[in-house]
């Protein structure tokens, strides 16, 4: 599902532990790391997509997490021209994302990246809250900065 402006609706997931660290996932067979994210299907709300993607990409269920916050609006990034599939219709030029800040309630050993036939990640680790800004692929950096900045106060006041 692509919107009229060419952006694919998507959810981004920032999963935190009790130490305030975030789950940082390695893309399968690559030296690229990112937060879990995924598209919103036509019949889904952003929250529905969040739980589906959380299970598909990280192996966690609804009961394993608590939603602490969500970004107020859509955050957009454009794909670099080399990644735009110019022969597909409708043309997708980027993603528009709702970002969710989650707290892990269960044991971290429940995190599994191999539950689907086509896993997106093959490793993960806990990193400091702001660490991803210096590590994520350049074209996603501004969206990460905006999401982390907007959601940070909720992490700091969660108790």
From Swiss-Prot:
Record's keyword terms, sorted: Hydrolase
Domain Nudix hydrolase per the UniProt entry, residue ranges: 6-149
Cofactor: a divalent metal cation
Role, per record: Accelerates the degradation of transcripts by removing pyrophosphate from the 5'-end of triphosphorylated RNA, leading to a more labile monophosphorylated state that can stimulate subsequent ribonuclease cleavage.
PROSITE patterns according to UniProt: NUDIX, NUDIX_BOX
Record keyword Hydrolase present: yes
GO terms (BP aspect): mRNA catabolic process
Keyword Hydrolase part of the UniProt annotation: yes
PANTHER family named in the record: M7GPPPN-MRNA HYDROLASE
GO CC terms in record: cytoplasm
GO MF term list: mRNA 5'-diphosphatase activity
Pfam families from the UniProt entry: NUDIX (PF00293)
Motif (Nudix box): 38-59
Gene3D superfamilies linked: Nucleoside Triphosphate Pyrophosphohydrolase (3.90.79.10)
EC numbers on record: 3.6.1.-
UniProt family annotation: Belongs to the Nudix hydrolase family. RppH subfamily.
Name used for this protein in its record: RNA pyrophosphohydrolase
């Amino acid at each position: 599902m692509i919107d009229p402006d060419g952006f694919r609706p998507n959810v981004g997931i920032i999963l935190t532990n009790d130490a305030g660290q975030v789950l940082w996932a390695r893309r399968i067979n690559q030296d690229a790391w990112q937060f879990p994210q995924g598209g919103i299907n036509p019949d889904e709300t952003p929250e529905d997509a969040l739980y589906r993607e959380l299970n598909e990409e990280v192996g966690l269920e609804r009961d394993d997490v608590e939603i602490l916050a969500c970004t107020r609006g859509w955050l957009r990034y454009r794909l670099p021209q080399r990644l735009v599939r110019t022969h597909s219709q409708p043309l997708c030029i980027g993603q528009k994302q709702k970002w969710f800040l989650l707290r892990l309630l269960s044991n971290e050993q429940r995190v599994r990246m191999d539950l689907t036939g086509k896993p997106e990640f093959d490793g993960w680790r806990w990193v400091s809250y702001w660490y991803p800004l210096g590590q994520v692929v350049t074209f996603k950096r501004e969206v990460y900065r905006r999401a982390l900045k907007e959601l940070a106060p909720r992490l700091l006041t969660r108790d």
